[in-house]
């Protein structure tokens, strides 16, 4: 999910630049809020959050980006707190709702995570990220068929890149040995079915794995 979340950052950065044009925030501060370095991201987003001229929607985005940095550092309770603020400021942020659902999943707060991801999908029904989150929650709950449906929806909306990511993750999990070609085949489906039957199996690879194969 970390890799999925990072794919949103370029578009969100462009959106934030447009939103803060009249707030007095520097372009460097905005860039820091979207840095790949978590400490710089926390500092940049904190500066934006403290800017009294920032509108609620943009401040919500800054909280969400700082929350992502905390989550990537493993500070999950702090991430939840920032996502709480992001959603309070913008209750229609499907991204913040989905990302909070993911953190709640990581904290084994599955029912709360399911509530969030359902809200996220009601706002953005074609989000591959949210379908992936719900698939993980359903897998953890033992809802194998429902989890499979969501993984398939995630691939449908996420396209070749996400299929490759799953292929690489399932290969790393030891349940798939086919090509990393972005095609959803019967072999890949069988690998998914095996993985979904194992609560500890994650079809997403570790963050630094598969970079070359999926680029």
Regions found by a protein language model. Name each.
Residues 72, 106-107, 140, 172, ...:
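Register position in tetratricopeptide repeats
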Residues 51, 55, 89, 123, ...:
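Structural marker of alpha-solenoid helical repeat scaffolds
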Residues 161, 171-215:
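Short acidic, glycine/serine/threonine-rich helix-capping segments at coil-helix boundaries
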Residues 56, 60, 94-95, 128-129, ...:
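Helix-start (N-cap) detector for alpha-helical repeat units in TPR-like alpha-solenoids
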């Amino acid at each position: 999910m970390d890799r999925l979340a990072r794919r949103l950052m370029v578009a969100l950065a462009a959106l934030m630049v447009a939103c803060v044009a009249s707030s007095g925030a520097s372009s460097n501060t905005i860039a820091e809020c979207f840095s790949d370095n978590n400490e710089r991201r926390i500092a940049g987003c904190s500066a934006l959050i403290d800017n009294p001229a920032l509108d609620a929607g943009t401040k919500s985005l800054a909280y969400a980006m700082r929350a992502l940095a905390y989550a990537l550092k493993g500070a999950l309770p702090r991430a939840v707190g920032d996502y709480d603020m992001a959603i309070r400021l913008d209750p229609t942020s499907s991204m913040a709702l989905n990302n909070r659902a993911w953190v709640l999943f990581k904290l084994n707060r599955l029912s709360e995570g399911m509530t969030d991801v359902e809200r996220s999908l009601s706002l953005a029904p074609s989000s591959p990220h949210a379908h992936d989150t719900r698939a993980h929650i359903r897998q953890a709950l033992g809802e194998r068929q429902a989890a499979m449906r969501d993984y398939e929806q995630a691939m449908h909306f996420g396209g070749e890149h996400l299929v490759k990511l799953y292929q690489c993750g399932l290969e790393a999990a030891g349940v798939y040995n086919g090509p990393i070609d972005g095609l959803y085949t019967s072999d890949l489906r069988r690998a998914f079915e095996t993985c979904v039957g194992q609560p500890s199996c994650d079809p997403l690879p570790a963050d630094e794995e598969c970079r070359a194969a999926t680029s």
